[in-house]
Curated annotation (Swiss-Prot):
Protein task: F(1)F(0) ATP synthase produces ATP from ADP in the presence of a proton or sodium gradient. F-type ATPases consist of two structural domains, F(1) containing the extramembraneous catalytic core and F(0) containing the membrane proton channel, linked together by a central stalk and a peripheral stalk. During catalysis, ATP synthesis in the catalytic domain of F(1) is coupled via a rotary mechanism of the central stalk subunits to proton translocation. This protein is part of the stalk that links CF(0) to CF(1). It either transmits conformational changes from CF(0) to CF(1) or is implicated in proton conduction.
Keyword annotations of the record: ATP synthesis, Cell membrane, CF(1), Hydrogen ion transport, Ion transport, Membrane, Transport
One Pfam family matching this protein: OSCP
Cell compartment(s), UniProt: Cell membrane
InterPro entries cross-referenced by the UniProt entry: ATP_synth_OSCP/delta_N_sf, ATPase_OSCP/d_CS, ATPase_OSCP/dsu
HAMAP family (UniProt xref): ATP_synth_delta_bact
Annotated source species: Moorella thermoacetica (strain ATCC 39073 / JCM 9320)
Primary localisation category: membrane
GO MF assignments: proton-transporting ATP synthase activity, rotational mechanism
Protein name in UniProt: ATP synthase subunit delta
Taxonomic lineage from the root: Bacteria, Bacillati, Bacillota, Clostridia, Moorellales
Keyword Membrane: yes
Entries under NCBIfam families matching the protein: ATP_synt_delta (TIGR01145), PRK05758.2-2 (NF004402)
Amino acid sequence: MSEQNVARRYARALFNIAREQGTAGEFANGLEEVSRTLAENSDFRRVLYHQLIPVREKQKLIDTIFPDINPLLKNFLHLVLAKGRERALPEMAAQFRRLVDQAENILPVEVTSAITLREDILAGLKERLAGITRRNIRLSSRVNPELIGGVVIRLGDRVLDASVKKKLELLGEHLKRA
């Protein structure tokens, strides 16, 4: 079974439990914290993914690094390690977040701009997008100086590119055809 299918099944099972417990948001945050730590800390990733390190040692490591994580989520992570599915954890976190977002009518939106946008601009954008989409918006922003100006807005799987860089690329293509 592919890693994505495994991740989807584990995420769905955990989501069903979390929804019953009313802890879906807490679990999503916990899974994202584990996933982020895997991405950012090569030592943690190396130990967790190493085949010769006993499962019990990996479980102790999870307990040590994430002492405040929900006990039920900790048990889930222990199960994932016991089944040898630790490499699927980042995808499980992503799948779980999608399930939570879908259940709570949340649309993840990422705004990329050439400069840091003021909070009032982001708040206004969030409000307008919520009105247009009739969904709750989880807005994140990042800076990419290569855009020169303007913004790129990613709404779920759609992208609205209103950057100067994109407009210059389109102008260049138009001039090449002329």
